[in-house]
């Protein structure tokens, strides 16, 4: 089968897949959606992603202990990018805060059903002392919160030679490749720049630099 257009807007390669014979196709009269279209977001996955979030949002914490929220980002094709908020209860008596429990939660997420198709998982812990409530659906604020606290020598966790989405061709073989978990928690380590520094603007190799966040 293949090549065919996939849910991320690309074309898959040819592979051997099970043969399915279709004898009848049923359709509801006056259907709201007579058909769906796959391709770059927002397409089919957008609507289904929103529906799944509304149906399963409250049940996620019951399925995965310690998990407060998880959001599949539509702009990334829904399942390739997950943003999650967990709990940090392992060492509350220590002054130094660092990822611990959220690492076990990350493993649970990547081992659960369709969540296992994620390519990138950003996860932090609920912060009750923060002036605002962290929300996985407010993507820009979520990224800014994590990047301000991330230790890049410690908080990048690569999963190599593992199972990945069939439509992910970044690996060496079909269904085999890598994933990345970014787990950050604790005190602020840096203040993110709101403007592009002059040191970057004046580089010979760079012509136009714009800041999109924060």
Language-model regions: role of each:
Residues 1-214:
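Charged, compositionally biased interaction regions
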